[in-house]
Amino acid sequence: MMTHQTIGGVTQTVCAVFGIEDGAAQIEDAFAPVVAHARSLGIERCERVLLYAPDAIGFHVCQAFPEVIGPVAQRASLIVQMKSVVPPVTPVCFATMFTGQPPAVHGIRRYEKPVLRCETLFDRLVSAGKRVAIVAVKDSSIDRLFRNRPVDYFSEPYDPEVTETTLQLVMADRHDFVLSYHQEYDDILHRTTPRAEEAIGAMQRHVASFVRLAQGVERSWGSRHRMLGFVPDHGGHIDPDTGKGTHGIDTPEDMDMQHFYGLFRGEYVLGRHR
């Protein structure tokens, strides 16, 4: 996969579609195809954004199981290829994704979960007057890294509760930005292998959850310019010593990524956007 961008482009992409000014000088550029597509639809500023972040669903497992990932592309048809970051472990990846900065700048370079002190996407959103919600499995990286900000945190027992809470937030329509995190595929990957039947079953459940969230977004946010994203953090490979799934090294199976984005114009109400 030939690409110079990393998952760090997520932060500036979200800010760009919201019309928020550039942040720190070291932040990675937005994904140009996403911003260009928004402008081609006449969307200068989105009013709502939902990002769904399933753990460890890399490019290669998507390529191996197109029938599984297919419903995601139907709901979010703009596919952007990119790299993860080294080492491709969850806290390093999500710290990069939601600061726009490399590990050398945000400071997380191994598997650890401190509260980040640098500027994050969520700080920029709040500064721009956006109402932010983060829904994640309790004590996961996303649940812990971005604490101590004026955002709404929802820590849930596991993926099904995350989905239900996220749907409730979308239907209530009181937040401009919602981040939703799932982890079952990664959990099973480590117990089995990235393409084991049990792991692919978890991947199917992630896809089904994304479809439910997309349907909720369409129902609740249909009058608003909006963006929907399927944004995993890294992939996985088989450890030759254990025969089980793992990740954390600079190998294509861990590093090659693709994200899925959907941008939609709001429906008009009496000639104006509600």
Model-flagged regions — what are they?
Residues M1-R274:
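Feature captures the catalytic ectodomains and active-site-proximal regions of enzymes
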